[in-house]
Amino acid sequence: MAIVLDGKSLALKIRQELKQKVEEQEVKPGLVVLLVGEDPASQIYVRNKERAANEVGFHSVVERLPETTTQEELLEKIKTLNEDDAIHGILVQLPLPKQIDSQIVLEAIIPEKDVDGFHLVNLGKLLQKDESIVPCTPKGIIRLLEEYKIDLTGKEMIIIGQSTIVGRPMALLGLNRGATVTVCHSRTKDLEKQIARADIIISAVGKPNLVLREHVKKDAVIIDVGINRLESGKIVGDVDFDGVKDQVSAITPVPGGVGPMTIAMLLEQTYLNACKRENIYE
């Protein structure tokens, strides 16, 4: 039976530690989330982030903007937040309405307040092995692996999905830790063959049953980033959890695996930004 990599418990531990640090340091990290439109999934994600930020003692604000918001209006809002010394982290909830270019918007956030880690400056730093601000989901995956003492050195790591949110930064974090990394995508030939040789499998596609028992080798480690809602209403990942759990050595559940860690890393990066701004050294 596989070890279940419990992201929910680890995220709670990290949040409790952050709350204690905020109280001891008397620093009040400021986090603003910009939500444009009424996307139901985004509403849930933002609500979870707001609740978590308030629990650890942050000054947390969610600015809800109408679906009709123009790119210029959003950029002006970001400009104001960039100049506000009480704000240490700015997050724009994706996806944005079609009239707004998300890349232009993300680049408008100054790198020091880019707690999502999506700014080209921060991604470029990651390329140079500077992990000061890293996309939150890959960072959360690394922390989860470290918590369970899963060493990546010399391991064959297969990442399914090449987004700048998960796949590409995850590949760099894996390389930084001595893994041999292969990134698979929609044009990868014979995906099952690639998966079969992997020691570490990270799937971030959004396709149920993409990874099955017959695809994975014994004692592999699986990180399931996918979130899929079935017609029954059940939330599942990309991996057939019940099918593979007796085959692999460790696996993240969905929900309760990577998702909580993403929020925990968002809070941690906001806190570290606040410490840097206030000249408090961790």
Predicted segments with their positions:
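Short, well-structured alpha-helical segments in soluble
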Residues: 73-85
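Glycine-rich phosphate/diphosphate-binding loop of Rossmann-like nucleotide-binding domains
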Residues: 36-50, 132-221, 234-242
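Short beta-strand elements in bilobed, periplasmic/extracellular small-molecule ligand-binding domains
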Residues: 53-67, 181-183
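Glycine-rich phosphate-binding loop
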Residues: 86-96, 101-104, 197-230
